[in-house]
Amino acid sequence: MRKLKDIKPLELKDDVLYVINQLKLPHELVWEKLETLADYEKAIKDMIVRGAPLIGIVGAYGFYTGIKEGIDYIQVYERLKQTRPTAVNLFWALDRMKSIYEKYGNDLNLLLKEAKRIEVEDYHANRSIGGYGEVLIPKKANILTHCNTGALATAGWGTALGIIRSAFENDKDITVYVDETRPYLQGSRLTAWELLREGIPHYIITDSSAGFLMKKGMIDVIVVGADRITLNGDVANKIGTYSLSILAKHHNIPFYVAAPSSSLDFNLESGDEIPIEERNEDEVKNCHCCKVAPQQSHALNYSFDITPADNITAIITEKGIIEKPNKEKILKFFGRKLS
């Protein structure tokens, strides 16, 4: 078994949260200090931190910080909710923090304990996802992944990338193909950085070359993350995931989604109900301060798309695997009744 380094994207020191500024990677490793509610809002909105599980964890610490500042708890809750609209983990974590406040009042110790609990639970969930998921990876495999679903997107280890990490840890002979993931380049900037640190063989590819690699027989498995999963098994994830799922189905390649159960939204029937974040067009027209398009042109910049359950081979959670997901299977898996 290989020994891997673990990356922690956040650290609490003297009641202040420090986070890796993911906009600076891969060339600089910079830690940002979050001391006020406004700091937390900016960190999430501006994608200094990103990844659905990590946003939830940072949101929980942000709730604690806002209460510590003396801001009304409903205002804290609403301000943090408005930072990113698609990832359900943020709302799930804020609901937990709000519930503690409404039950016990302004008890900062209990609020901080709950935020820490959310962080620890996520880390253990990721390790469990890795354990379930790596069983699905052949002993020798070329794996395609999209965006960043590793330690940088979570409390540590990762979801889809955690499965890849677990497979490599268990001595499997894998090569990872990393979609660059325009326009924020989370694949080429963040996933490649994590894989390089671990010594996991990988190639960065342009998003548009994925289908060609599948046609050439160069991809055995696709593993992606999720920002929100609805009752029927539809998945909201980084823009480009839907296209990959169609290509995978056409080429008969297993398409796995890895996510903690906190990414399940039992209030939504299907992906049609998920609000899709549309970000500033300048993110498409400019790439890290370089202008790459006529500035007078307009650009569309949807951050997420919806992959239908029909295109998904299985959803891998910390509780186990849901094959060919649908509403009945998801409710049964989580011990809920059909309404």
Curated annotation (Swiss-Prot):
Keywords on record: Amino-acid biosynthesis, Isomerase, Methionine biosynthesis
For this protein, what is the EC number? 5.3.1.23
Q: Which residues form the active site?
A: 227
Role, per record: Catalyzes the interconversion of methylthioribose-1-phosphate (MTR-1-P) into methylthioribulose-1-phosphate (MTRu-1-P).
Matching entries from SUPFAM superfamilies are given as: NagB/RpiA/CoA transferase-like
List the source organism: Sulfurihydrogenibium sp. (strain YO3AOP1)
Q: What is this protein called?
A: Methylthioribose-1-phosphate isomerase
Looking at its record, which EC class is this enzyme? isomerase
> Looking at the record's lineage, which domain of life comes first?
Bacteria
Pathway note: Amino-acid biosynthesis; L-methionine biosynthesis via salvage pathway; L-methionine from S-methyl-5-thio-alpha-D-ribose 1-phosphate: step 1/6
Q: Which Gene3D superfamilies match?
A: translation initiation factor eif-2b, domain 1, Translation initiation factor eif-2b, domain 2
GO MF term set: S-methyl-5-thioribose-1-phosphate isomerase activity
> What residues does substrate bind to?
50-52, 84, 186, 237-238
Name the residues annotated as site: Transition state stabilizer: 147
Give the record's family classification: Belongs to the eIF-2B alpha/beta/delta subunits family. MtnA subfamily.
